[in-house]
């Protein structure tokens, strides 16, 4: 970075501003986290120079001896960590991984059955604005009045629509999905079961959340979010189906990507190694504990939580009773240096740009070593702002508290 400082002052200043923003803000976006300095070093290494189309031992370019070793190391670690016998670590993102799975197993026009975006699903699970909703016929299941998946309804929809694939996984669901139930439903209609565990990758790696690998035909993951690695995707499978694995590999390259990002693959390999350390399990346990603490404190302050609980790293606040939109809530909180994202809630009548809820996640604050007392205080600061959304004095007072607590927990323990 020192070279960048002198060569491109304009860019460096902006990077420094973002560094300061991260240090001085409390991050509660469930999909964001902080990577280690080891991950950053790998991602900024000379590996960015190397083209390596293909797979280890089967490249279309020469000079791949060492990048082959790096990619194979990452593959082996992914297999070990998730008890898989197949791993593709080339996808540039979770969405790229999902596209590759669909492309490998489906034809345009095939039916998929997945969780509705407004009920906690993801854009790539069949949303009409996404490739998955444009290429495939998406039918959706959702959550019941208690905020939980009703598997009998999922089974009914599967029997009625006979999907080629059932998609499990979420971006905003605080429960534990019963993978076995979904597999039984998929088998009943001879469908593939595809699980997108992007949000819970770290929790699964640590054994905190049930591993979908024994139940799914194929699983995708991201290496950021709860895994706390670089931004990127994984495809995993078990069961020894070599024909399936060949389809998946071909769908990634050459089906949807060219040369893999070897500097990112090296960073993924480091993150996977970090996830094997016993301290990582402690970290993941604390993520869930902190989320549960926040839910309890919000409930004490009479805020409505979708499903009333959480068993993972996130939860949704339903703000309709407070007559606040998600957009207004996130804007007010950001003025106090608290970052959340507005989020649709089940049966939300507001647009995705406004929403009736916010999503809160604890991976980043836990990574930053916030303790239980800090998490309780933070919960009440959020409640105070949401109860006085136009009170500048309260917001400014809480911002000062946020700045003080952030200074106690620097992200990278260095000056800027």
From Swiss-Prot:
Site note Plays an important role in substrate specificity, residues: 224
EC number(s) per entry: 2.1.2.1
Reactions accelerated catalytically: (6R)-5,10-methylene-5,6,7,8-tetrahydrofolate + glycine + H2O = (6S)-5,6,7,8-tetrahydrofolate + L-serine
InterPro entries in alphabetical order: PyrdxlP-dep_Trfase (IPR015424), PyrdxlP-dep_Trfase_major (IPR015421), PyrdxlP-dep_Trfase_small (IPR015422), Ser_HO-MeTrfase (IPR001085), Ser_HO-MeTrfase-like (IPR049943), Ser_HO-MeTrfase_PLP_BS (IPR019798), SHMT-like_dom (IPR039429)
Keyword match Zinc: no
Domain of life: Bacteria
Coiled coil segments of this chain: none
Pathway assignment: One-carbon metabolism; tetrahydrofolate interconversion; Amino-acid biosynthesis; glycine biosynthesis; glycine from L-serine: step 1/1
GO cellular component: cytosol
Cofactor: pyridoxal 5'-phosphate
Quaternary context: Homodimer.
NCBIfam families from the UniProt entry: PRK00011.1 (NF000586)
Name of the protein in its database record: Serine hydroxymethyltransferase
Gene label: glyA
């Amino acid at each position: 970075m020192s070279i960048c400082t002198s060569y491109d002052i304009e860019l460096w200043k902006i990077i420094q501003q973002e560094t300061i923003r991260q240090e001085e803000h409390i991050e509660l976006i469930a999909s964001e986290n902080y990577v280690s300095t080891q991950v950053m070093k790998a991602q900024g290494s000379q590996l960015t120079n190397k083209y390596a189309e293909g797979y280890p031992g089967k490249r279309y370019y020469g000079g791949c001896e060492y990048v082959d070793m790096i990619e194979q190391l990452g593959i082996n670690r992914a297999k070990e960590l998730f008890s898989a016998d197949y791993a593709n670590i080339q996808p540039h993102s979770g969405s790229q991984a999902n596209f590759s799975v669909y492309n490998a197993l489906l034809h345009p026009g095939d039916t998929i059955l997945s969780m509705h975006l407004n009920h906690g699903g993801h854009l790539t699970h069949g949303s009409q604005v996404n490739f998955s909703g444009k290429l495939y016929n998406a039918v959706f299941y959702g959550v019941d009045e208690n905020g939980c998946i009703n598997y009998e309804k999922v089974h009914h929809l599967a029997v009625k629509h006979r999907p080629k694939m059932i998609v499990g996984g979420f971006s905003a669901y605080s429960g534990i999905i019963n993978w076995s139930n979904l597999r039984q439903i998929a088998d009943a209609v001879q469908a593939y079961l595809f699980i997108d565990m992007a949000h819970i990758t770290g929790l699964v790696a640590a054994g905190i959340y049930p591993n979908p690998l024994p139940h799914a035909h194929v699983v995708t993951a991201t290496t950021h979010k709860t895994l706390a690695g670089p931004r990127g995707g994984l495809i995993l499978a078990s069961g020894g189906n070599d024909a399936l694995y060949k389809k998946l590999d071909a769908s990634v390259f050459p089906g949807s990507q060219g040369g893999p990002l070897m500097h990112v693959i090296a960073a993924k390999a480091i993150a996977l190694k970090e996830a094997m350390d016993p301290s990582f399990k402690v970290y993941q346990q604390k993520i869930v504990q902190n989320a549960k603490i926040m839910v309890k404190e919000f409930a004490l302050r009479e805020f409505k939580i979708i499903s009333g609980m959480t068993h993972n790293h996130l939860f949704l606040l339903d703000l309709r009773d407070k007559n606040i939109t998600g957009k207004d809530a996130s804007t007010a909180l950001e003025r106090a240096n608290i970052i959340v994202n507005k989020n649709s809630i089940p049966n939300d009548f507001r647009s995705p740009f406004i929403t009736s809820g916010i999503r809160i996640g604890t991976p980043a604050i836990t990574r930053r070593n916030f303790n239980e007392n800090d998490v309780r205080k933070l919960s009440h600061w959020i409640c105070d702002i949401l109860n006085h959304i136009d009170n500048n004095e309260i917001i400014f007072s809480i911002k000062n508290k946020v700045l003080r607590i952030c200074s106690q927990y620097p992200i990278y323990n260095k000056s800027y």
